[in-house]
Swiss-Prot record:
Subcellular location: Host cell membrane
UniProt name for this protein: Protein OPG164
InterPro entries: Orthopox_A36R
Gene Ontology terms describing biological process: actin-dependent intracellular transport of virus; symbiont-mediated cell-to-cell migration in host; viral release from host cell
Organism: Vaccinia virus (strain Western Reserve) (VACV)
Assembly with partners or alone: Interacts with host NCK. Interacts with protein OPG161 (via C-terminus). Interacts with protein OPG056. Interacts (via C-terminus) with host kinesin light chain/KLC1. Interacts with host intersectin-1/ITSN1 and EPS15.
Primary location recorded for the protein, binned into one broad class: host cell
The family this protein is said to belong to: Belongs to the orthopoxvirus A36 protein family.
Gene (UniProt): OPG164
Cytoplasmic side: 23-221
Keyword vocabulary terms for this entry: Host cell membrane, Host membrane, Host-virus interaction, Membrane, Phosphoprotein, Transmembrane, Transmembrane helix
Length: 221
């Protein structure tokens, strides 16, 4: 008889204690629940994005496979057409009609020859092959090319060669140090010309006099 009221008292006391504990921890329970809810929503979004990406990847793979298959088909068609062209035995199949009378034959030359060279034309009426080549300027060997030397007359105002005397009749300009003077008077202001002494010049004059005397003696003999 005593056990029944004891059990009821313990049950009531336990429920009250549990309710009190839950009341105290209600804030923590709410925060945990909210955090779990947020985590679940994020997981759902990640799963949905992964599923969409997987679908897009499968679509892109299928598109790539379709593109590759289309390229292979085009290559097969090109190979077939090339084989048909190569297997063609008739030479007329590879000719190009320029107009009604002339037929242009396929060029067997190198690409550089075709750029700088000629084109072969076949005339159907005369059955003759004529090569039309680009005109080039050729200098004949008989033609003489004037060379710029000392004898050529040039405009002194436009003399470009400092080593050539374009005016032999007049005295050379002092501004050009590379042209030798015709007389024996050497300029002192020109550092490039060799300065001869008076003894050297007198010696040259004496040599000329001796040469004149010897020539006169020889003529008398």
């Amino acid at each position: 008889m005593m056990l029944v009221p004891l059990i009821t008292v313990t049950v009531v006391a336990g429920t009250i204690l549990v309710c009190y504990i839950l009341y105290i921890c209600r804030k923590k329970i709410r925060t945990v629940y909210n955090d779990n809810k947020i985590i679940m929503t994020k997981l759902k979004k990640i799963k949905s994005s992964n599923s969409s990406k997987s679908s897009k990847s499968t679509d892109s793979e299928s598109d790539w496979e379709d593109h590759c298959s289309a390229m292979e088909q085009n290559n097969d068609v090109d190979n077939i057409s090339r084989n048909e062209i190569l297997d063609d035995d008739s030479f007329a199949g590879s000719l190009i009609w320029d107009n009604e009378s002339n037929v242009m034959a396929p060029s067997t030359e190198h690409i550089y020859d075709s750029v700088a060279g000629s084109t072969l034309l076949i005339n159907n009426d005369r059955n003759e092959q004529t090569i039309y080549q680009n005109t080039t300027v050729v200098i004949n060997e008989t033609e003489t090319v004037e060379v710029l030397n000392e004898d050529t007359k040039q405009n002194p105002n436009y003399s470009s060669n400092p080593f050539v005397n374009y005016n032999k009749t007049s005295i050379c300009s002092k501004s050009n140090p590379f042209i030798t003077e015709l007389n024996n008077k050497f300029s002192e202001n020109n550092p490039f010309r060799r300065a001869h002494s008076d003894d050297y010049l007198n010696k040259q004059e004496q040599d000329h006099e001796h040469d004149d005397i010897e020539s006169s003696v020889v003529s008398l003999v």
